[in-house]
Amino acid sequence: MQTLETPQTTSKPEFDTTIHRRKTRPVKVGDITIGGGFPVVVQSMINEDTLDIEGSVSAIRRLHEMGCEIVRVTVPSMAHAKALATIKEKLAQVYQPVPLVADVHHNGLKIALEVAKHVDKVRINPGLYVFEKPSPTRSEYTQAEFEEIGEKIRQTLEPLVISLRDQGKAMRIGVNHGSLAERMLFTYGDTPEGMVESALEFIRICESLDFYNIVISLKASRVPVMLAAYRLMVKRMDELGMDYPLHLGVTEAGDGEYGRIKSTAGIGTLLAEGIGDTIRVSLTEAPEKEIPVCYSILQALGLRKTMVEYVACPSCGRTLFNLEEVLHKVREATKHLTGLDIAVMGCIVNGPGEMADADYGYVGKQAGYISLYRGREEIKKVPEDQGVEELINLIKADGRWIDP
């Protein structure tokens, strides 16, 4: 599943139709690789209590079967951390090993050290890992105070970094705009710069211990903040000679149509710029509903092709058949033929030209009849009521049909 075609180039990259992804180091998470030119990885997170062993195993399996390649679980206590050992064991017994990430937050050193034994990656939040309760009377941090807390962070982070390094496992430094540490807020403000500096502080500690299996995220609930943070992170990493892969997401995107649009606006924009190595669409819905959105974003950008690509005009007064109904029938009949491009066009105006790149075309040319195309070549004209059946026969004749 993790294979890439040879990138195409033109003499003017700014007008290229191929997305040129930023070069990043490969980071292994179980049997999945993030970055390093591998396909963009799809992630999600279960919402079961990790102490519910059976429920967690079932939830992880459901996500993985839908195409979620890395699954995150929350680990708020030592009991939850130890439960991961059983979850991992049961997954292997009743299903198969699945790359797992533990989400560790407030003052989580002991929890992180325990759970690092049982998962493939540990996610920490720099704003909460060494949690300093905000003071209502404080208005600034002196340089000495800033550095004192920085040293405390180093002492607390080092044991986890050493553990992950020695086990060959990975870490995600996951900055959230809404949970920046107070000293970062006072020093840099509630800004993308504060998010980036927060991540860099943790990266430098990791690098000082020769640990480089790092993935970075800088999430925000507002798309413009999220975009600015990732772009600034890339700029700073380029300046510092860093090549860590990036995990993209809009946190707290909500639900329904708007939640999907909001996530796509953030994630899709960065991916189109070549930024991003793994994604999670965060919806206030069942986690399983996040996975199709992820793959749709990747397919739309040409980064991963995991379904049929349908090209269809929006319909107008020239349309010679019920376009919406026919598109539905074509989709239902062919949606399992991963890798094909199929065009459904209502009239000859938008027909051959607009669908030139499609493998097959279904075009209205005169009332009661449709024309079937292979690429740019018209193959036959058939009665409208036989159109879908004849399209299937054409695909079969070309040896490109597989039974659903």
Curated annotation (Swiss-Prot):
Pfam families: GcpE. GO terms for biological process: isopentenyl diphosphate biosynthetic process, methylerythritol 4-phosphate pathway; terpenoid biosynthetic process. It is an enzyme of class 1 (oxidoreductase). The keyword Endoplasmic reticulum does not apply. One of its GO terms (molecular function) is 4 iron, 4 sulfur cluster binding. Pathway: Isoprenoid biosynthesis; isopentenyl diphosphate biosynthesis via DXP pathway; isopentenyl diphosphate from 1-deoxy-D-xylulose 5-phosphate: step 5/6. Binds 1 [4Fe-4S] cluster. [4Fe-4S] cluster binds at residues 313, 316, 347, 354. InterPro entries: Dihydropteroate_synth-like_sf, IspG_bac, IspG_bac-typ, NO2/SO3_Rdtase_4Fe4S_sf. The keyword 4Fe-4S applies. Its EC number is 1.17.7.1. This is 4-hydroxy-3-methylbut-2-en-1-yl diphosphate synthase (ferredoxin).
